[in-house]
Amino acid sequence: LGVCYGMMGNNLPSHSEVIQLYKSRNIGRLRLYDPNHGALNALRGSNIEVILGLPNVDVKHIASGMEHARWWVQKNVKDFWPDVKIKYIAVGNEISPVTGTSSLTSFQVPALVNIYKAVGEAGLGNDIKVSTSVDMTLIGNSYPPSQGSFRNDVRWFTDPIVGFLRDTRAPLLVNIYPYFSYSGNPGQISLPYALFTAPNAVVQDGSRQYRNLFDAMLDSVYAAMERTGGGSVGIVVSESGWPSAGAFGATQDNAATYLRNLIQHAKEGSPRKPGPIETYIFAMFDENNKNPELEKHFGLFSPNKQPKYNLNFGVSERVWDISAETNSTASSLISEM
């Protein structure tokens, strides 16, 4: 499990304090949305695995020529390797023909290819996978999960991405938020189904039973990729979370329940793909410069580094008990069982 380190706040701790917090909480993975050198320098020697974002604003530039991709990889990857364990480069976040990022869609695959080539030229092709992070707006049919498919009007965009990932043996990064499905459709989707607390199967899909929406969403993307020749492509859940305030269903209790259950569930996998799911929780901190209001309330921590929830963040047989002291003493790490 990992946690996304967003920086859209004017009151957040220093980069070195943040990385120290990751280490003291035994959080072994981190997602960065852009190659912030302050954060990358703080990550040196930490052994934390990183999803490094190439931001949307740079995608067109990177697509326009190999020299730009080479420069970007040298400056933001090679200069920090191997002190920083960059595992994936996410070229763009939630670029989609059906959202406000549609102007970037034609540059997505050329940018992926250029960064992939530049990483290979840098001698890091076996160490770093190149992918992109997508959201569920690309999925047309998601019910039942086995019938998952990409929207027909985005296939021109998704098919080449899936083909690229298949050919380079990289996973697709997917942002999965049961919260938004639930809050947009509470009449059809029950809160327990969204929070992993439904006592029984809610959806019967052939021989597969679904007791939570997260699995149903995840498996619908697997099915969609299979339909487009990407049956061998894995998925990394690059964001998932629940807001604690700011909108319908966004409460401290709901967020705590979702996060606690997500952390546990990520070890188990989905009906279609059992086994641990590499998952990144959004986000490390409440970020007060984000909009709309609910976007300010996704943090596991307040900007003063105080935990908002009591969670067991089980990494390498350790428990993260944030009801314990919030400094970096060993007493906040209790061994599991």
Swiss-Prot record:
Residues 315-337 form a propeptide. Signal peptide: none annotated. Glycans are attached at residue 327. Keywords: Glycoprotein, Glycosidase, Hydrolase, Plant defense, Vacuole. Is thought to be an important plant defense-related product against fungal pathogens. It catalyses: Hydrolysis of (1->3)-beta-D-glucosidic linkages in (1->3)-beta-D-glucans. GO terms for cellular component: vacuole. One of its GO terms (biological process) is carbohydrate metabolic process. Belongs to the glycosyl hydrolase 17 family. The lineage of its organism: Eukaryota, Viridiplantae, Streptophyta, Embryophyta, Tracheophyta. It is an enzyme of class 3 (hydrolase). Induction: In leaves, in response to infection, elicitor, ethylene, or wounding. One of its GO terms (molecular function) is glucan endo-1,3-beta-D-glucosidase activity. It comes from Solanum tuberosum (Potato). The active site is at 94 (proton donor), 239 (nucleophile). Pfam families: Glyco_hydro_17. It is found in: Vacuole. This is Glucan endo-1,3-beta-glucosidase, basic isoform 1. InterPro entries: Glyco_hydro_17, Glyco_hydro_17_plant, Glycoside_hydrolase_SF.
